[in-house]
């Protein structure tokens, strides 16, 4: 097979996979809107209560699952290129923890309950600070994969400790509700909270279009400069975009781990590392994974609802362990 035929075949395979993923997402979305404590049949007219349940509860929650899953998956894929580490992920590296810590600080310092916009800004600042710490340490100290993971885990533990202290000394009910939410939950998502989505979506689309630039960065700084990339400027733009996505995702749904690790890594294993295709496919696959996980979180138990973060951790942790073993065997 000639080179141009091979490239055309590969592009066709990526596009076919993208269409299949979109179809799966649409089917799961329809199922998501139907199932729950009250089953909504698509073949019968809805009562006023059922219509309100669909429009005011299930639809905004479905949208939250989609945008959070897409944002985390694309952020993970971008971080893996920026840090040169296939195991990089916002939750594992402690970046999500930094966003949650900033939100708790905002909750303590402000005299009134912060609005979703204030929470979002605090989360973005926290994610940006932790991302800069990681990128700075990785570049200055030339950290190996294992050492970078240790630094990320340490940052996550540190932020988690501060958050736990804050909850322990607080009698405020809102803080206790926030603690459940920080475990990863979109149960309280409403249209009001989707002000955050208005900020997230343009950044997500922009980042999905940066695939060719990321492909050049993967060749190394020297080659990227020769190919016309302003590496310094591009790196800072990508860091800011990733921080905005992670901050918005945490503000909307709390800490949801492993989506940004599992989705891009499995897609790379199956289809290759071309970021111009990988990033859009990661967005659809991340959205699909989170919609699927939240269906299980809502329906697995009759008497309670599981935090979404628990479901993604249950799915992602075994895959993460397998990836660590595989990485060790490769060396």
Swiss-Prot record:
Gene3D superfamilies: ABC transporter involved in vitamin B12 uptake, BtuC. It comes from the Bacteria. It comes from Vibrio vulnificus (strain YJ016). The keyword Transcription regulation does not apply. Keywords: Cell inner membrane, Cell membrane, Membrane, Transmembrane, Transmembrane helix, Transport. One of its GO terms (molecular function) is vitamin transmembrane transporter activity. Belongs to the binding-protein-dependent transport system permease family. FecCD subfamily. It is a multi-pass membrane protein. It is found in: Cell inner membrane. Part of the ABC transporter complex BtuCDF involved in vitamin B12 import. Involved in the translocation of the substrate across the membrane. This is Vitamin B12 import system permease protein BtuC. The complex is composed of two ATP-binding proteins (BtuD), two transmembrane proteins (BtuC) and a solute-binding protein (BtuF). InterPro entries: ABC_BtuC-like, ABC_transptr_BtuC, ABC_transptr_permease_BtuC. One of its GO terms (cellular component) is plasma membrane. Coiled coil: none annotated. GO terms for biological process: cobalamin transport.
């Amino acid at each position: 097979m000639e080179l141009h035929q091979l490239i055309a075949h590969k592009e066709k395979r990526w596009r076919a996979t993208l269409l299949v993923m979109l179809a799966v997402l649409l089917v799961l979305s329809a199922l998501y809107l139907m199932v729950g404590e009250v089953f909504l049949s698509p073949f019968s007219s809805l009562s006023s209560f059922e219509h309100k349940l669909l429009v005011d509860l299930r639809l905004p929650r479905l949208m939250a699952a989609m945008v959070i899953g897409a944002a985390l998956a694309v952020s993970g894929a971008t971080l893996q290129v920026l840090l040169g580490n296939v195991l990089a992920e916002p939750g594992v590296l402690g970046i999500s923890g930094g966003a949650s810590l900033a939100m708790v600080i905002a909750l303590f310092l402000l005299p009134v309950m912060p609005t979703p916009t204030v929470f979002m800004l605090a989360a973005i600042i926290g994610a940006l600070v932790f991302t800069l710490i990681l990128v700075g340490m990785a570049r200055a100290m030339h950290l190996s994969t294992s050492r970078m993971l240790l630094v990320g885990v340490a940052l996550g533990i540190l932020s988690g400790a501060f958050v736990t202290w804050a909850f322990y000394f607080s009698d405020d009910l809102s803080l206790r509700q926030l603690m459940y939410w920080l475990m990863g939950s979109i149960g309280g998502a409403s249209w009001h909270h989707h002000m955050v989505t208005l900020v997230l979506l343009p950044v997500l689309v922009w980042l999905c279009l940066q695939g060719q630039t990321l492909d050049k960065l993967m060749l190394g700084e020297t080659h990227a400069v020769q190919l016309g990339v302003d590496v310094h400027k591009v790196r800072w733009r990508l860091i800011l975009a990733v921080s905005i996505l992670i901050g918005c995702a945490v503000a909307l749904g709390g800490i949801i781990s492993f989506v940004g690790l599992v989705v891009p890594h499995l897609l790379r294993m199956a289809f290759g590392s071309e970021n111009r295709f990988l990033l859009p496919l990661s967005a659809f696959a991340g959205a699909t994974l989170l919609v699927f996980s939240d269906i299980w979180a809502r329906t697995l138990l009759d008497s309670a609802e599981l935090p979404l973060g628990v479901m993604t951790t249950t799915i992602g942790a075994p895959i993460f362990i397998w990836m660590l073993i595989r990485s060790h065997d490769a060396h």
